[in-house]
């Protein structure tokens, strides 16, 4: 019997270590395990960072996981520009398709490449200040890394975006044609396995009234905006202070290193906030359970997973009135969208919701696209 010549697929994911980026890696890995029978004629080489664990009982022999010591942006660029090319040459590998799960492409001009794009900073129309400590990294991504990304793309690049604004931004920033971009939503079916969280709401009578804002401390997440809203509310409605003092706004930031905490302290607002530091997944779910209101004032997102999590728990959500928000939650009745920079509107909405809290039925959107479409593209372009 004639042996089958397998197609070799390179999958680069060395930068996917935390948060939503790691979720993409885990979803890809789990889907590949589930679909292994559909890819018997393929060999996958998955490159991830040292310390990232991928758990599976039966990893197919067609999947080779390669751990690499890539711990900073210099090591990452070195791997992607030089290291991968050297690795392929040493293995004498004929690659059918390059797959990037981390927005940047590959430096092989004549090869097909499938790029899962989820880094909003290089394509968002905003300038960052290199001299501001909390914007330096964003400036690097917006200027230097953006040029490297452009260098890594070729005429055979195909892009995956999660929401429409990213699709348009890819066209505007890198002059990519519409037929090179596919909008594919991430997998949210795993929430069905978390139904036990709904059965035990985790709240106790002794708990404060929680307002939850799960986000890292980047300027575009808008923590300072929330602090300003609270200050404005106290100034314009001082008679509401006794009620406000029974609430806590939860920031998932480290109180010892947070610049936002220093601002809160200067304004004497400490009693209204709870700083948890980094929380585990289960801890995050508990805070969703306990909270009566979820805030999402972020103005740069490639998807916005906390919106899904909040709707799953049937929570009232106050969010910026941006297109990606309504795209992620197209018909959730607990979503209230507020003009991004309208402080008065946010004050009014916050005050109304702490005076009258409402819960809703658990909700998950039914997206038309998903990982099946992504793996279909792997077959199509390999």
Locations of regions flagged by a protein language model:
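Conserved donor-binding/catalytic core segment of Leloir-type glycosyltransferases
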Residues: 10, 203-221, 227-230
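Membrane-proximal helix-turn-helix segments that form the acceptor-binding/catalytic region
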Residues: 138-159
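Glycosyltransferase donor-sugar binding loop
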Residues: 46-51, 214, 242-261, 277
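A conserved mid-protein helix/loop that constitutes part of the nucleotide-sugar donor-binding site
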Residues: 19-30, 218-235
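Conserved acidic donor-binding segment of nucleotide-sugar-dependent glycosyltransferases
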Residues: 335-344, 352-354
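Nucleotide-activated donor-binding/catalytic signature segment of Leloir-type glycosyltransferases, i.e.
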Residues: 259-282
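Short hydrophobic beta-strand element within catalytic cores of glycosyltransferases
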Residues: 316-319
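Aromatic "clamp/platform" in nucleotide-sugar-dependent glycosyltransferases that forms part
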Residues: 299
